[in-house]
Amino acid sequence: FGKKVDVNSFSGHDNDYLSLINDKRTIPLTYNHKARYVNDINYDIYRLLNPGEDASNEKIADIMPYKNRLHCFKDKYYKLIPDRPSRTITAHLRMDCHSHIHPYQIRAITPREAARCQSFPDDYFFLGAYLKTYMEIGNAVPVLMAKQIAKIIKQYI
């Protein structure tokens, strides 16, 4: 695939959701699973927040870069809650992923993880510039939702 797509091995279905989005297929490789660089300030913020906590948390008040603008950046930093639905995946992830901090690791979600939230199968890969993949994923209609809408429309055709 060249230098634009990261390829990782994958051992199979970890849960029912992965089985569903992959149509019960075992997919040996995943694509676009590379985390973004995290600078020192964001590393500390990511480390200090617990799942479900955001930029308004007192633990990060002294290092929060947007503390004087919390009224407009209150959702700037958010650590996802494990085993709960994700926040909405948006094209803004192209700019930064602070609104989707991984619940266990000190990093933001990868394009592959964002694509999984949008129900893209693991063998779907995004070509092109790394940050563009976040925009493509954020602008997409979730695959499973599109399938359900198509099923209903088909009944009336």
Predicted regions and their residues:
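C-terminal target-recognition/interaction regions appended to catalytic cores
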Residues: 1-157
